[in-house]
Amino acid sequence: ESSAASDVYKRQGQKIIQDNGYIKADEKAPAYKSNGAKGKVVVGGSSSVTPVMEKLKEAYAKANKDVTVEVQQSDSTTGVTNAIEGTCDIGMASRDLADSEAKKGVKATVIAKDGIAVIVNKDSKVDELTSAQVKDIYTGKTTKWADIK
């Protein structure tokens, strides 16, 4: 695991994550101390992770003057693929790894969690949905509101 990737777990990184509207992944993260790293780190992938990664990049740069962090925004699949192929050092994804991706030797590390809201029309008789019901709607298993019980 790269130093830059593990540093996101440090107390300062988790505070940045929380300050940007995400849920911290590690409530007990230790304080970060620079290890004197030098060079360039390329981070690429998910557009939904990019804003918080830019904030983490700023904080990391302050603590590590000899490191350049380049953040490339695309999508989760591109981020994972580029990490597998070595085009980037850290891939950003806003989803779990597919089994086929995990088999290629990359490791997923959750740095934050975000909330997703499902909004229903005000005239709908449905006023509450379970996660299973939302899944069934989006996978096509449930196609009629009348089937929601």
Place the predicted regions along the sequence by residue.
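Single conserved hydrophobic/aromatic residue that forms the stacking wall/gate
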Residues: 1-5, 9
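Hydrophobic transmembrane signal anchors and adjacent membrane-proximal interface regions, especially
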Residues: 8-9, 30, 37, 117
